[in-house]
Amino acid sequence: LDWIRKPEEPAGAAGRPLTLLSGQRLTLGQFSRDKAVLVYFWGSWCGVCRYQSPIIDDLAADGVPVVGVAVRSGSSAEVAAYMAKRGLGFPTVNDEDGGLARSWRIVATPAVVLVKNGKMVHYTTGISSYWGLRARIFQADVFG
């Protein structure tokens, strides 16, 4: 089903500033210059995301560059409270109205997009294992 749900990198995505819940601003172009970045589209309302998010958090804790995108999950305070309650610490952008996800043509969550040097090099939807994602990240770093 991934080929049906394939996201599309929006024009200018590499240079578009993103603001994390922490207030830090970054661009995917800068953040993905040296290593592939895992961009994780998820929602607090998404049942499958409740299983995927701890895996993403483990990857981030192990040094994988991660940017979460909380899609239509409430205010920034609500997203931060949701993450704190579940012990999730990966950097996250609040996509309160879903506009960022729409610009990437994300039609299902959870969705993982790997970005290297500002370009999308891999994507998948649904649940993925820690080691499955690690393998994709390695592949993106070496061949991306």
Question: Language-model segments: which ranges?
Answer:
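Structural microenvironment flanking redox-active thiols in thiol-disulfide oxidoreductases
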Residues: 50-86, 96-102
